[in-house]
UniProtKB/Swiss-Prot annotation:
Protein keywords: ATP-binding, Cytoplasm, Glycolysis, Kinase, Nucleotide-binding, Transferase
Organism in which the protein naturally occurs: Latilactobacillus sakei subsp. sakei (strain 23K) (Lactobacillus sakei subsp. sakei)
Identification of the protein by name: Phosphoglycerate kinase
Subcellular location, principal: cytoplasm
Family statement: Belongs to the phosphoglycerate kinase family.
Amino acid sequence: MAKQTVADLKDIKGKKVLVRVDFNVPIKGGVIGDDNRIVAALPTIQYIIDNGGKAILLSHLGRIKSDEDKKELTLKPVAARLGELLNKDVAFVASNEGQELEDAINAMTDGQVLVMENTRFQDIDNDFGKRESKNDPKLGEYWASLGDMFVNDAFGTAHRAHASNVGIATAMKANNKPAVAGYLLEKEIKFLGEAVDAPERPFVAILGGAKVSDKIGVIEHLLAKADKVIVGGGMTYTFYAAKGLSIGNSLVEEDKIELAKELIEKAGDKLVLPVDNVVADAFSNDAKTETVEGNIPDGYMALDIGPKAIADFENVLKDAKTVVWNGPMGVFEMDNFAKGTLAIGEFLGNLSGATTIVGGGDSTAAVKKLGVGDKLTHISTGGGASLEYLEGKTLPGIAAISDK
């Protein structure tokens, strides 16, 4: 990776180190549903405090549209959970600008950790509009002024240019201060980058999810890079329509059928679609179901891939040396239509001798549900960011970091 990393930082002891982490965790009534993203940030935080740095953490949490949102989306419970994981006191400051924050930072001792309030409170707490989300340079400069060096460890927001990532990095570099990648960001770029740019072959991509429109760029980019691209999930049926198959009441993007036709022609035998599907007479876990090959009957909608498709996909995957999986094979949140997604997750968990990378909420949830997460090479923490990276796009949060 041609970007400077936290390991390149010199003389951290006594320095104020700003760290953009991704603590955007599911939270309800102050209870954290999944602390994975907090855990993922620990190596970078630990490195800074072990070397005597003062770790000042910034993160967003959810989208803030009202004062009501602010009560639900405070980072206070996240700071408490971080303290438990680090087994040390973590200071929380209920603001992200002003005297209270500045005093708390100036009072920090070496090896201490401080979490400031949700950066997106800046999207409503002022007369200037969405200062954080719109990357207000003055806000980036202000936050940069609070530290001696900046570490971006938030891959989940790397595809967005916000004041708390691009803004701070830009201001730091303008003042000849370091702006580097944390261990998590470095790991994401390493695994996703190597998978796409220098994969051990055969390289198989598995793409699921509801919409072709969300994944068009990724499909096109990966068709040029991968040996096979497996397509499942709701977007399958736009491809079915493009092939002239009947799709019943299945999800379809009418305005993307022509594009799907072009992709099928361009891909040749690289593109692998499900040969059979589990269909239902209603979008419900209790609906009447059947397994059908090819055409989907009128009055039915396809909600998962069928057993022959699972066997086909596993046959393609069994010899793979690199696999990237993003998106479910069916309506994963309904048990009766989760089998395809779970089967792929289980197969990848038991695939030996291959680099296996999983991204996206449902795919990640599937491997966790199966307990095979630790058997995979890498679980990406970025949904949209990993998709844009797989599409070959430059991510602003990474571009803003200092080059080696």
